[in-house]
Amino acid sequence: MANIAKKYYNEERDRLVNMNTRFSSLSSMSRNLNLLALRGDLAPVFHREAEVEAIEKMLLRRTKPNVLLTGPAGCGKTAIAEALAIHIANQKVQWEYENAKAEREYNKAKSAWDAENENKPVAELTPAPVMREVPKPPLCDVVIFDLSMNALVSGTKYRGEFEEKLEGIMNDCRKDPNIVLFIDEIHQINVIGMADGAGGMGQILKPALARAEIKVIGATTTEESAILKKDKALARRFSEVEVRPLIGDKALETADSILKDYATFHHISVEDVTAEQILEMVNYHVGGVFPNNFIDVIDETMSGARFERRSSVGFADIKKTLSRMTGNIIL
């Protein structure tokens, strides 16, 4: 069964690689998040099912299927876009597998039915088997591209070069309605490309967003979303999803998973300290927004241990990192 599932994983991976080749303008300035998800290059995301479901519903809209993620800096808005890509990629492979399984079951039943009814008159035939229907998830063909604003702007020395690059991306999106752009720091589209009387990126995108020729998931902080909302016509093209920092048990469970994930990445074991203890210390000494504050501390601690060629970190190492980050002696 594992080999069968691997077959559909490979087929979906090949489809995504081919998309990168077909849509050269888009792939040269973005990351294919679905492909990264299939390769296991995206970190797992926990307790964001509600936000992912809200985005999925908005992407299915006939008009203005565009989403604006807002929330405090560091609360995990980009991670939600990655969680959506992971969900879609897994959904597609699972559907392909279940659909093929239903087809195999039908073929087996049909062969048995043919053998049983081979010499019977029509009046005595038993009911023929019917293939089990496997409903296709509505978004399982969607592919999310994380657009790099720096790649879009860089190298545009002369008037019209920026517009040409942006139009190339938009044309790629028009060719395949399953393409969704993820734009981090989306409030910048109000000013990017504004020169010599040009309207900027937002003005170029606005008609295509309204006609659903392209689909966009944008992310920005609550404060900076006001910059985007200054253009009321542009803001109306988006449906807002508020992203709140995880708290309580959800934060603890997520912190524990993040700690294990980073320990695996750095090949470091964690001794005499728990994720809950680290989270309490981070909240008390550093503040900030979870999970960004928590990740900063454990990543710096573990990278320091790797630099020193150590195989483990503990309570003392966490305190040392916090002391360095805050400038205070933490006992």
Give short role names for the model-derived ranges.
Residues 2-331:
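AAA+ P-loop NTPase nucleotide-binding core of proteostasis motors
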